[in-house]
Swiss-Prot record:
Residues 1-10 are cytoplasmic. Mn(2+) 2 binds at residues 557, 559. Its main location: Golgi. Its cofactor is Mn(2+). Residues 132-407 are annotated as: Xylosyltransferase activity. The chain crosses the membrane at residues 11-31. It catalyses: 3-O-[beta-D-GlcA-(1->3)-beta-D-Xyl-(1->4)-Rib-ol-P-Rib-ol-P-3-beta-D-GalNAc-(1->3)-beta-D-GlcNAc-(1->4)-(O-6-P-alpha-D-Man)]-Thr-[protein] + UDP-alpha-D-xylose = 3-O-[alpha-D-Xyl-(1->3)-beta-D-GlcA-(1->4)-beta-D-Xyl-(1->4)-Rib-ol-P-Rib-ol-P-3-beta-D-GalNAc-(1->3)-beta-D-GlcNAc-(1->4)-(O-6-P-alpha-D-Man)]-Thr-[protein] + UDP + H(+); 3-O-{(1->[3)-alpha-D-Xyl-(1->3)-beta-D-GlcA-(1->](n)-4)-beta-D-Xyl-(1->4)-Rib-ol-P-Rib-ol-P-3-beta-D-GalNAc-(1->3)-beta-D-GlcNAc-(1->4)-O-6-P-alpha-D-Man}-L-Thr-[protein] + UDP-alpha-D-glucuronate = 3-O-{beta-D-GlcA-(1->[3)-alpha-D-Xyl-(1->3)-beta-D-GlcA-(1->](n)-4)-beta-D-Xyl-(1->4)-Rib-ol-P-Rib-ol-P-3-beta-D-GalNAc-(1->3)-beta-D-GlcNAc-(1->4)-O-6-P-alpha-D-Man}-L-Thr-[protein] + UDP + H(+); 3-O-{beta-D-GlcA-(1->[3)-alpha-D-Xyl-(1->3)-beta-D-GlcA-(1->](n)-4)-beta-D-Xyl-(1->4)-Rib-ol-P-Rib-ol-P-3-beta-D-GalNAc-(1->3)-beta-D-GlcNAc-(1->4)-O-6-P-alpha-D-Man}-L-Thr-[protein] + UDP-alpha-D-xylose = 3-O-{(1->[3)-alpha-D-Xyl-(1->3)-beta-D-GlcA-(1->](n+1)-4)-beta-D-Xyl-(1->4)-Rib-ol-P-Rib-ol-P-3-beta-D-GalNAc-(1->3)-beta-D-GlcNAc-(1->4)-O-6-P-alpha-D-Man}-L-Thr-[protein] + UDP + H(+). Residues 408-750 are annotated as: Glucuronyltransferase activity. This is Xylosyl- and glucuronyltransferase LARGE2s. Mn(2+) 1 binds at residues 236, 238. One of its GO terms (biological process) is protein glycosylation. The lineage of its organism: Eukaryota, Metazoa, Chordata, Craniata, Vertebrata.
Amino acid sequence: MLCPCRGKLKLLVVSLSFVILFTWLYLLVGNSENGRSLLLSACLVESTEARLLERDVLASRVREVEEENRQIRLQLSQSQGLAGQPAEGNYGNQQWVASADTGPEDVENTAEERANHSECSRSPTAEKCELLHVACVCAGHNASRDVVTLVKSILFHRRNPLHFHFITDTVANQILSTLFQSWMVPSVQVSFYDADELKSEVSWIPNKHYSGIYGLMKLTLTKALPSNLSKVIVLDTDITFATDIAELWAIFRKFTEKQVIGLVENQSDWYLGNLWKNHKPWPALGRGFNTGVILLYLERLRRMGWEQMWRLTAERELMSMLSTSLADQDIFNAFIKQNPVLVHQLPCFWNVQLSDHTRSEQCYTEVSDLKVIHWNSPKKLRVKNKHVEFFRNLYLTFLEYDGNLLRRELFGCPSQASSESTVLQQALEELDEDDQCYDFRRERIMLHRVHLYFLQYEYSPTDDGTDITLVAQLSMDRLQMLEAICKHWEGPISLALYMSDAEAQQFLRYAQASEVLKNRKNVGYHIVYKEGQFYPVNLVRNVALRNVNTPYVFLTDVDFLPMYGLYDYLRKSIVQLDMANTKKALVVPAFETLRYRLSFPKSKAELLSMLDMGTLYTFRYHVWTKGHAPTNYAKWRTATTPYKVEWEADFEPYVVVRRDCPEYDQRFVGFGWNKVSHIMELDAQEYDLIVLPNAFMIHMPHAPSFDISKFRSSPSYRYCLTTLKDEFHQDLSRKYGSAALKYLTAQRNI
C-alpha cells in the first residue's frame, strides 16, 4: 500500500525540484546578459526584501525585452519597405534619421546606434590624403562673399587635400581667383569654369527662383567639369559645414551600383502641395529632395546619358508647369520621381535646412547631430527658427574667423607648392633675421589676402575718354569719412580697406545700413586683410590703384574732402591740358582745418576768405612745410590758369595722373615717405607737375594714427625708415640712371 504513495511522492519532489532549478537558471541567465548576478539574491532567498528586489529586476527585464522586440519589428518593417522600393511612400514617410544612409556594414548596429545621432567613432572617412572635389556655382558680388564663409567652414574642419571647382561669371572669377591666389592655402587647388559658356544649356528654361539662370547651372556639371572627374560634392553658397567634409565624401562608398545621386530629403512641405490653396509644385517623391548638398557620381551620370535625360524631363514637365519655382531642384526631383532607384538618400543632418515652412528641428536633438547648415531662405540669417540664434552664432564664427589661420599644412600629405608660395619662401630665406630692420623687409614681401569688390560695383566709364576715379585707402578708424566723400565726389571711387575679417563684417553692416553708401554702385570696396605688425599703406594703395576701370585716377587720402564739383572740373582740365598725349600730373592744392564741424567753402573765393580768417590753413604748414610748399600757394591765390612747378625734396602733393602711372613702392610701410617716394618716381619718369588754379581739397581733423606714434617714439623705427630711403635712392639710380642722382643729392642737402 505504501509503495504506490511513496512513488508518487518521489515524482512530486522531483517535479518541484526541476521547476525551482529551471526558474533559478532562467533568472541567472537573464540577468547575466545585463552584467548582473543573482548569487547574492539566492543566498538571501528567505529575505522579503530580496524577493521584492528580484520581482523589480524581472519586471525591468521584461520591459527591456519588449522594447527590443518592438525595435526589431520596426527595423524589419523598414528593411522590407526599402527592399520593395515603392514609387512614392518610401521617401515621403521615412523618419529623418541616420538609418536612411545605412550600408551593408551597418547591419549589426542596434536601433539606438542608428538613431539620429552622429557616431564620430563609426563615421566613415575618406582615405588619408585622398583628393576631395567640391563644386559650386557662384555668380555676382554677394555670392562671392557668401562662398568665402562656406570655404572657411570647410577648411577649418578638413583633413584632406581639396580641389574646388567654381562655375563663375566674370565678376566672381575676378574676385575668387584673386582671393585664392593671395590666400595661398596649402593642399588646395582651384579651377574656374565660365558660366557664360553654359548659359545656352539652361537659358530656355523659365525660372521664377531668385537665383536666376545660375540656379539651373548644376544641371550642366557633367558637361562643365573635366571628363576625367568621376565624383564631386556639389554645394550651394549658403552652406556652413560643422564637420569634416571627408565624412560626406565617404558616403560615395555606400552607393549601390545603380545609384548616381546622393541627396537629403526636403525638410518642408513644399512638394506635398499643401502650403497654400491651389499650390501646385513640380512632381517629387513624397517630400522630394533638396539640392543644396549633392553627391554626384559624374562617371555614372555621363554613362547613362544624364544630359539628355534631364532635358527630356524638363521639357515634359514644362508643358504643364510652364516654369520652375525652385530652379534645378524642381528638375532633379521630377527626374528622381521617374527613376527612384538612382537616388541615395543621405541622413538629414547633411543638409539641415533653415527656410520658411521647414521642419528641420526634427532632424537633430544635440549639437553633435549637426553636420551641414543650409540657409536656403531669401531671408538668410533673418529666417524664423526656434534655434536660429545658435545657428547664426555658428555661421558668424566662420564669417569673422581669421582666414590667415587656415594656411596650415596638412602633415603627411605631399602637395605641390604654388608659384607664389615658392617665390615668397625663397624671398624669406634670403632675409637676415639678425637685421635690425628685418620686420620692415619682411613686410615688403608679405602677401596679404585680398577680396576685391566686397560690395556690388556697377560702373562703365564715360565714352569721351576723360573719366577719372578717386583712389584712396583707409582702415577701420577712418570709416566715418566715407559718406562725406561720396557727397563731395559723384564720380567712381576705388577704396582699399585694411581690415581684419571681423572688421570687414562690421564695415559690411555699416555700408548696408547707410542710405548714402548703399545707393552708390560706382564705389569699389577692396578688402586687404590684416597681417603683420605694420600698416602696409602702399600695398593697400596699389590694390585700389590696380582696380580702376577709368583712364585717369585722382590719388588722394580718405581724410580729405574734395571741393564740390571737382570731378567735372578735373575732366575738363584733362581735355584742356591734353593729358592723353602728354605725361602730366595735375596737382590739387591741399588745405586743412582743425575744426570737426566746418562750413565747407563752395568756391575758391570762399576758401581764400576762410584762409585769411584763420579757419583754414595750407596743409601741414606748421608741421611739414616741405611736403606742400612747392605748390606755391602765394601764386595759386591769384592764378587763373594752370602753372608748372618743379619737384623739390619731400614734395608729396595729391595728383591726377593716367591709370598706367607707376605704382607706390611697397617697401614703405606705416608712417613716412610712402607718398614722397611715389612723386619722386613720377618726376624720374619725366611727368610735368601742373597745379590747377581752381581746384582744392581740405583735410579733416582726426586722432594721430598708431604708426605716426611709433615713428615719433621709436629710434629703431626712424633708423629703419632712413635705411629704406637710402635703398630706394640706390634702386632709383639703377632704374633711371644718372638722371636720378639729383634725388640723392637733394636728400643729402636737407
